[in-house]
Amino acid sequence: MTNDPINWHGTTILTVRKGGKVVIAGDGQVSMGDTIMKGNARKVRPLGKGDVIAGFAGATADAMTLFERLEAKIEQYPGQLTRACVELAKDWRTDRFLRRLEALMIVADKEATLVLTGNGDVLEPESGVVGIGSGGNYALAAARALIDMDLSAEEIARKAMGIAASICVYTNNNLTVESLDA
């Protein structure tokens, strides 16, 4: 950790799949060095025709570019989220411009939850819970501890994100939550 004023930090994104629902929650904080620049950024959004939800961690402009590219792949391969993500990952890894983009994405539809990285990885977590970003591991641990409780996917996501926000200085409680029937 440095106090370099150009060092952007932030974002916690968490996905919880439980009880016929899939939820992606993201915090709203964007930090530059040790300064909070924005507290209400929207890092989670629906894609396609609303049948896919996604969240990003990383540089905002990079993530917006990747969201646009992913939406194009979803349109190109309707109903085939994994294929659309693999095609995006191929482009991300091989395209001269795209490979410089620094972001991680979680993408989910009614059937799958996938993590996309700039290394060309498309990972499907073995459990229905995954976290990315500066507070991702805190949120992930909290959600795993809560998953067997009598709570909905959204309740678990909100509680876990609250726990992450209480630990990670780059995460706040201003949440954006999107959900789908799974």
UniProtKB/Swiss-Prot annotation:
It is an enzyme of class 3 (hydrolase). Keywords: Allosteric enzyme, Cytoplasm, Hydrolase, Metal-binding, Protease, Sodium, Threonine protease. GO terms for biological process: proteolysis involved in protein catabolic process. InterPro entries: ATP-dep_Prtase_HsIV_su, Ntn_hydrolases_N, Proteasome_sua/b, Proteasome_suB-type. Pfam families: Proteasome (PF00227). It catalyses: ATP-dependent cleavage of peptide bonds with broad specificity. One of its GO terms (cellular component) is HslUV protease complex. The keyword Protease applies. Allosterically activated by HslU binding. PROSITE patterns: PROTEASOME_BETA_2. Its EC number is 3.4.25.2. Signal peptide: none annotated. The active site is at T11. Disulfide bonds: none annotated. GO terms for molecular function: metal ion binding; threonine-type endopeptidase activity. HAMAP family: HslV (MF_00248). A double ring-shaped homohexamer of HslV is capped on each side by a ring-shaped HslU homohexamer. The assembly of the HslU/HslV complex is dependent on binding of ATP. PANTHER family: ATP-DEPENDENT PROTEASE SUBUNIT HSLV, METALLOPROTEASE TLDD. Protease subunit of a proteasome-like degradation complex believed to be a general protein degrading machinery. This is ATP-dependent protease subunit HslV.
